[in-house]
Amino acid sequence: MKAWESNIRKVEPYVPGEQPKVQDVIKLNTNENPYGPSENVRKAMEAIDIDRCRLYPDPDVTKLVKSIADYYGMDNNQVFVGVGSDDVLSMCFLTFFNGKKQVLFPDITYSFYSVWADLYRIPYEKQKLDDNMKIVPEDYYKENGGVIFPNPNAPTGLLMDLDSVRDIIEHNKDVVVIVDEAYIDFGGVSAKDLVNEYDNVLVVQTFSKSRSMAGMRIGYAFGSKELIKALNDVKFSFNSYTMNMTSIDMGVASINDKKYFEECVERITATRERTKEELTKLGFTFPDSKANFIFATHKSVPAKEIFEKLKDLNIFVRYFAQPGIDNYLRITIGTDEQMDKLISALSEIVG
């Protein structure tokens, strides 16, 4: 080993869902929205003055922060915006989890959590889900250095009711509690209003799922003005200009089109419920997802076999080799046509 190699920070990186390099695939593996952004977003993109590219974007992201704050009934100083919710969450780990006590999060959850904890040298302890794959609030009563969990959880899709979320917060008033709501729009009640009751709570959301803008990388957090200031202080210590002007303008256009947003979410949730019925007929079982995906296992055919056979048909779903969930597939909800093709393929595979 070379001498300088001992100074390299080594981590096990996050592995994203496969991005197919071929055309004509049915892509149901990364929980993207099957429908494009609203017409308002297209118009905003066309209206962008190319001459503005020579200028730095607004470091405070003022227009987008105000639009998000107005939409959700928050003050501007209660909103933080970042380059996708991954950026926001990473900043949260770096900003708020700096003690010697272990940060708590579920053992089956968004796998980026352990990556960030390892990267930033944060001690952590994973809490097991129960036999029904549910988060157990009582497991988060113990002494800790912070708490984070998704709601709905990923990859299970299970939603925790707001009373249970509040219960976890009530037992953790001395640390920062982060509720990751990437999928909340598909069937849950947001915990966002709790930031007005608890000054230690952050609620993180994204434009990537319900607003069809994964490619523009827009995430945001709600919290007390003290928490938001702390996040901005850390952000400006890395990069003053995290959001590009295109994302800012298109984000404003998206958040202001409530009608399209609601129609799009309604279409996806209707397709999800129909897909659940069809999967059940084929012998699949799954938690009752309230997200834009279904986490399914088959009674007799191994998940990896199904995954590989679907891939041969250019249908991409997500397979996890992680113990405990290595016989499950996470299936993103696509268009009705895409899901019909998936069901047809599955009927041939599982027979």
In which residue ranges do the predicted regions lie?
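Conserved PLP-anchoring active-site segment centered on the Schiff-base-forming lysine
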Residues: T95-W116
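PLP-dependent enzyme catalytic core of the Aspartate aminotransferase-like
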Residues: D163, K309-R318, Q322-G351
